[in-house]
Amino acid sequence: MDLLTLWNLEREEVLKIIEDAEYFKKNRCGHDILKNKSIALIFESPSTRTRMSFDLAVHELGGHSLMMNEGEIHLGKKESIADTARVMSRFVDAIVARVKSHKTLEDLAEYGSVPVINALCDLAHPCQILADLLTMKENGKDFKGLKLAYFGDGNNVSNSLMIAGAILGMDVVIATPRSYEPSGLFVKKALEIIAKYGEGSLTLTDDPEIAAKDADVLYTDVWISMNDKNKNLEEILKIFPKFQINAELLSKAKEDAIVLHCLPANRGFEITDEVIDGKQSKVFDQAENRLHAQKSVLKYIFEH
């Protein structure tokens, strides 16, 4: 089974992945789920948390990881992605790929014969969001009816948050400047999932105060995302500051609200030092939870 986006998962499957992640967090070592298995880790862009957490996850589950960075592998350059996928499938038991284009993941999954896990692409960041859900749960947040407010650029993280929120019955509010909204495809998918379960809601707004009001979770990410170097920096610095998570915005949320950021953070831009280092910030627990959630994902794909 592949994990390219979250929308192919049922609610029970997401909850089971989170439950298993909790188990792995409490019982970090002594597992052999990946015994005699080799996992390819493909990275087209630099990474700290994703690379460390997946490499450790494979090792701590008893497997072997094979790291390949851009420039060390033919991935659509001098060889088709289809041929690369076919060859890699002869050597490894699964492919974890952090790539620039979602199409690369689709091609790896289509032409390869082993499971493919999306470790991040331009459209989605499913493994990050599973770690976020673990962080919410361990901070006493019930998913059903939870108000999750996202602030900033409508990027891969916001796309995947919408899907996860829809699956679990959350009330998700995405606050972005106009013309920086999340993917229309992901909005459509989220609304379809909400209709399927008959629970939850999705709201898009350009008013951060509406999003923050009585929120249980406040979430932000960098204003210039992967592959967005062509964005107008001057325009961003003009229209994005009102979407910053700061003490004033946080005061509009519930008293026990938590703050999340997938990191790396541009402190002083999308989030202030005061907030990210404050008592309501769970950012570094969230970063650690990448390891535990990704162990659970690896377990899941080899069981299905």
UniProtKB/Swiss-Prot annotation:
Keyword terms of this UniProt record: Amino-acid biosynthesis, Arginine biosynthesis, Cytoplasm, Transferase
Source organism (scientific name): Methanococcus maripaludis (strain C5 / ATCC BAA-1333)
Domain of life: Archaea
Protein name: Ornithine carbamoyltransferase
InterPro entries linked: Asp/Orn_carbamoyltranf_P-bd, Asp/Orn_carbamoylTrfase, Asp/Orn_carbamoylTrfase_sf, Asp_carbamoyltransf_Asp/Orn-bd, Orn/put_carbamltrans, OTCase_ArgI
Reactions listed under catalytic activity: carbamoyl phosphate + L-ornithine = L-citrulline + phosphate + H(+)
Positions contributing to L-ornithine binding: 156, 221, 225-226
UniProt similarity note: Belongs to the aspartate/ornithine carbamoyltransferase superfamily. OTCase family.
Biological or metabolic pathway of the protein: Amino-acid biosynthesis; L-arginine biosynthesis; L-arginine from L-ornithine and carbamoyl phosphate: step 1/3
UniProt: carbamoyl phosphate binding residues: 47-50, 98, 125-128, 262-263, 290
Subcellular location: Cytoplasm
SUPFAM superfamilies to which the protein is assigned, alphabetical: Aspartate/ornithine carbamoyltransferase
Bilayer-spanning residue ranges: none
Principal subcellular localisation of the protein: cytoplasm
NCBIfam families: orni_carb_tr, PRK00779.1
Any one GO molecular function term: amino acid binding
Role description: Reversibly catalyzes the transfer of the carbamoyl group from carbamoyl phosphate (CP) to the N(epsilon) atom of ornithine (ORN) to produce L-citrulline.
GO biological process: arginine biosynthetic process via ornithine; citrulline biosynthetic process; L-arginine biosynthetic process
